[in-house]
Amino acid sequence: MLIQSDYHIHASYYRVKAEGAEAGPTAVQQQAAARAAGCRYVGLLEHCNASPKHPFSCLVALAEEFYSDDFDRENTFLGVEADLNDDGSDACGAEGRAKLRLHYVIGSVHLSPAIIPTLDEYIRVEFNRIRNALIHNRNVDCIGHPFGEGIRYEKAGIIPRWGYDLIPSEYLQEILKLAKEHQVALEINRCDLQNEAYRRFWEAVRDNHLLFEIGSDAHRTANCTAVIERTQWADALGLQEEYHWKPRK
């Protein structure tokens, strides 16, 4: 049986917001919500990318809270969700990781129809970024929500339905091969749990003993419960705790 853990929890209090916007939770608030949801291990992070909402200073402030004298760090880890570039490098880098004293880096791709209008091009770009990160970037411990932005093309009305069956099988096979070769975890996340092709992808993760990680991607305390369903789904699929990735301190 899987131990419930969540390493993709945003302490969004520190990001830059418009005047009057909701403050967002601090690290201690998200930690409490994750523990209340049943998580034994908790990972707290924020975005690192080119957005003006996510300057590096917000990560510095999060790290200061995490390493403050009165913060309970038992079974709790500090990470970052860093955007992947075309060459596979990440927005945080090894220097940023060391400065912030991070325990892990999740490398993710964040795209949308406003940035790349066609689904095929989006899939190609995300695949190449993930592939290059797996081959070249030893700073990245996990690939966050692979192809999790595909649902945006359905919501925008560009395609009638999103699913992993729209991704070329050779792309998925290459990701599986490289993730195993370089011992990088893949994340269960977002909107694909009911898709049969997604299920087959994760059966391959199971059968080939790849590392995996489960995240809620919670930006609010109420969303920390999302990890429960995803953990139950992974458990029912037969994923083993032995390959359930965990950061190192």
Annotated model-derived regions:
Residues 40-41, 185, 211, 240:
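Residue-level detector of anion-binding/catalytic polar loops
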Residues 72-120:
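Hydrophobic alpha-helical segments and helix pairs
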Residues 1-91, 153-166, 174-175, 215, ...:
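An N-terminally biased module of ancient metal coordination in phosphate/nucleic-acid-related enzymes
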Residues 6-10, 44-45, 77-81, 106-110, ...:
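A cross-family glycoside hydrolase active-site/sugar-binding cleft signature
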Residues 33-36, 132, 178, 204, ...:
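Alpha-helical scaffold elements within enzyme catalytic domains, especially in hydrolases
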Residues 14-17, 100-211:
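Domain-core and long-helix interface of multi-subunit machines
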Residues 53-63, 115-120, 195-199, 224-225:
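Active-site-adjacent beta->alpha loops and helix N-cap segments on the catalytic face
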